[in-house]
Design a protein with these regions (language model features):
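Metalloprotease/metallohydrolase-associated module, dominated by Zn2+-dependent proteases
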Residues: 2-40, 45-53, 57, 62-66, ...
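Membrane-helix interface segments
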Residues: 3, 75, 92-96
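Multipass alpha-helical transmembrane domains of eukaryotic endomembrane proteins
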Residues: 66-73
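Short alpha-helix carrying the canonical HExxH Zn2+-binding catalytic motif
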Residues: 73-89
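Catalytic Zn2+-binding segment of zinc metalloproteases
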Residues: 84-101
Length: 140
């Protein structure tokens, strides 16, 4: 009975997070087609280690830098947990995740990377990143 409930709950979350899961599948196939990937099935989510820099979370998919795979450093551990924090945001916000977190986070990353003014600020002080850290239990 418990297994059946878990399957039903998983199906409901897949539907609740449908926009980001669909984008995650597309991104996965692009990476799988054009580069080597390491896939780790973690039950309710899939970690994909590839040529991406840093991390990206789309529904059930966490895309992480290949160098992070089996790397025990504290920085890598925090980055992986932080990315999983974004996955928790996706679970909470469902279809609103793309607008509330995804777009805002991408704009913040672009501003922080491209303009010196923004680099003077702590990257993780932005609301999307601070909340992901909090959900994942990451302390900086």
């Amino acid at each position: 009975m418990k297994k059946i409930l878990n399957y039903i709950l998983s199906a409901l979350f897949l539907i609740w997070e449908l926009p980001q899961n669909l984008i995650g599948v597309i991104v996965f196939y692009i990476y799988a087609t054009f580069s080597d990937v390491i896939v780790v099935d973690e039950g309710t989510s899939v970690s994909v280690y590839t040529s991406i820099k840093g991390g990206l979370s789309l529904g059930a998919f966490c895309f992480l830098q290949r160098g992070y795979y089996r790397n025990p450093s504290k920085y890598v551990e925090k980055t992986i947990l932080h990315t999983k924090g974004h996955s928790k945001q996706s679970r909470i916000l469902g279809p609103l995740y793309i607008i509330v977190i995804g777009v805002a986070s991408l704009i913040w990353k672009a501003l922080w990377t491209c303009f010196k003014y923004f680099r003077n600020k702590d990257y993780y002080s932005f609301y999307t990143e601070k909340w992901a850290d909090k959900l994942a239990g990451v302390e900086r």
